[in-house]
Swiss-Prot record:
The protein's name in its UniProt record: Methionyl-tRNA formyltransferase
Gene3D superfamilies, sorted: Formyl transferase, C-terminal domain, Formyl transferase, N-terminal domain
Catalysis: reaction(s): L-methionyl-tRNA(fMet) + (6R)-10-formyltetrahydrofolate = N-formyl-L-methionyl-tRNA(fMet) + (6S)-5,6,7,8-tetrahydrofolate + H(+)
SUPFAM superfamilies: FMT C-terminal domain-like (SSF50486), Formyltransferase (SSF53328)
Native species: Pseudomonas aeruginosa (strain UCBPP-PA14)
Length: 314
């Protein structure tokens, strides 16, 4: 390594915390950690720190939690840190150009997709939902645009037919930190230079919301199967049966046809439901007041609730 850098880290969720852990194991000096303000969480809506804040406090690092970085006071506070580089991972605040210009080497970002595909807020889930063959992490030099900056380094991983949003997240959370450490070494040595993105190839990973997690049985089974995997563990796909909500946490493609949403078969292998094209076998469900269970367990105790001919989602 050519030199140890003064680094400001900015991030919020567990994905970002994994990157901070990796940086703490390098000779670089973390001079401050920026993270989102504490948010209410849980049934009691108690204010809870982010994963990044908790880790930073464990290591005695200064923590900054501004509501915005657009005002002159916050920017002056950042400039006073005399950082060589700012590393940004799932921070959640927009960085104006004035902030991007403060560190000597600028700001770099670890983004959970193979840019320019899946710029935006939910790249992991959108890649699974779309049936992409691979995903990865791109380390880029940040610009004022949304995930538009020059690409410094890419690492890829195949997306398997069993991958969920959660499993792909965890794999990328292991790949990303190594890529960031490698990119920082190249920047410090002056040997790493960015490659411009092809905007014509860009796609956008819009933020997830609970409303889109409702299963639309008129869609093809192959699309719904990917949606179930993509939205596990959040926001979790759901439907209804006899006016009661039903969460769907596991599914596989099945054989059969009928009016969309119709239960074609119930067995220990799963609940077979007709779709717009093909059929989907629901293998892991959660009923109101219960915990997630394999359908075989529900079938043993609630067989009468899943009678053939009933229609889901009405």
């Amino acid at each position: 390594m050519s030199q140890a850098l003064r680094i400001v880290f900015a991030g919020t969720p567990e994905f970002a915390a994994e990157h901070l852990k990796a940086l703490l194991d390098t000779p670089h000096r973390i001079v401050a950690v920026y993270t989102q303000p504490d948010r209410p969480a849980g049934r009691g809506q108690k204010l809870m720190p982010s994963a990044v804040k908790s880790l930073a406090l464990e290591h005695g690092l200064p923590v900054m939690q501004p509501q915005s970085l657009r005002n002159a006071e916050a920017q002056a506070e950042l400039a006073a840190l005399r950082a060589d580089l700012m590393v940004v991972v799932a921070y959640g605040l927009i960085l104006p150009q004035a902030v991007l210009d403060i560190p000597r080497l600028g700001c770099i970002n670890s983004h959970a997709s193979l840019l320019p595909r899946w710029r935006g807020a939910a790249p992991i889930q959108r890649a699974v939902e779309a049936g992409d063959a691979e995903s990865g992490v791109t380390v880029m030099q940040m610009e004022a645009g949304l995930d538009t900056g020059p690409m410094l380094l890419k690492v890829s991983t195949p997306i398997s037919a069993a991958d969920t949003g959660g499993s792909l997240h965890d794999r990328l959370a292991a790949l990303g930190p190594k890529a960031v450490v490698e990119a920082i070494a190249g920047l410090a040595a002056g040997t790493l230079h960015g490659e411009d993105q092809d905007d014509a190839l860009a796609t956008y990973a819009h933020k997830l919301n609970k409303d889109e997690a409702r299963l639309d049985w008129s869609r093809p089974a192959v699309e719904l199967e990917r949606q179930v995997r993509a939205f596990t563990p959040w926001p979790v796909c759901h439907t209804s049966l006899a006016d009661a909500p039903l969460k769907v946490l596991g599914a596989s493609l099945g054989q059969g046809s009928g009016a969309p949403g119709t239960i074609l078969e119930a067995s220990r292998d799963g609940l077979l439901v007709a779709c717009g094209e093909g059929a989907l076998r629901l293998t892991r469900l959660q009923v109101p007041g219960g915990k997630p269970l394999a359908f075989a367990d529900l079938y043993n105790s609630r067989r009468e609730q899943f009678a053939t001919g009933q229609v889901l989602g009405q």
